[in-house]
Design a protein with these regions (language model features):
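A transmembrane-helix-recognition feature enriched in membrane-embedded lipid enzymes
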Residues: 28, 181-206
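A structural signal for short, hydrophobic/glycine-enriched beta-strand patches
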Residues: 31, 35-189
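N-terminal membrane-anchoring alpha-helices
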Residues: 1-47, 206
Length: 206
């Protein structure tokens, strides 16, 4: 009897060990996917360029948000799309929304108001993508180009696919968040968990 219990315990530990190894391998694959997708720019002619919201300070875009806007402006100037969708609501304590800050920046840089759509209610990536999907359906847009940081792209594209939005990724190359430094690595590791959650559970990856 004791021998049987030891045998059963041994098999259980082996199964747990294999499961742990499998989880580590899968997590490693997700980390690699975040990095690989983040380095692919698949921008092509579309109906709109979407700028994902980020922090702003008193109406002034943060360096992260400004890098996204700079990149979107270059795409707009190349004729990738004639419309900018600027996303992001007010975070706690803000006097203005991320989208409104982005819109002011875009107008100062020559984008006419008629080419700008402001989405200023969302407060998370999930909410932003749902808002983009609603706008795309209402405007009968066939496709959009998503602009954000490299670490963000896999989750955005998975969410877009789940929401039946045809989307192309175009990560900014000038963000102060660099994937190879400590801050960038933290973002990559976080996204390696958030991306599959966004696909499987959606709201859990906010």
């Amino acid at each position: 009897m004791a021998r049987q219990r030891r045998s059963l315990t041994g098999r259980l530990f082996r199964l747990l060990g294999r499961a742990l190894i499998l989880l580590v391998v899968l997590w490693g694959a997700m980390v690699a996917a975040v990095v690989i997708v983040g380095h692919r720019d698949t921008a092509r002619t579309a109906d709109a360029i979407v700028v994902m919201g980020a922090a702003q300070y008193g109406g002034r875009p943060s360096p992260v948000l400004e890098a996204r806007l700079d990149h979107a402006l270059r795409l707009y100037g190349r004729g990738v799309a004639k419309t900018l969708i600027l996303t992001g609501g007010r975070q706690h304590g803000d006097i203005t929304s991320e989208a409104e800050s982005s819109a002011r920046w875009a107008r100062r840089h020559g984008v006419p108001k008629s080419d700008i759509i402001i989405e200023n209610e969302s407060r998370s990536t999930t909410e932003q993508m749902h808002a983009v999907a609603r706008i795309a359906r209402a405007r009968k847009f066939d496709s959009v180009v998503l602009v954000s940081d490299r670490f963000h792209m896999l989750r955005l594209l998975l969410t877009a696919w789940k929401l039946n939005v045809t989307a192309y990724g175009s990560p900014t190359r000038s963000s102060p968040i660099v994937l190879t430094d400590a801050e960038g690595i933290r973002y990559v590791l976080a996204e390696s968990l958030k991306a599959p959650l966004a696909f499987l559970l959606e709201d859990a990856a906010r």
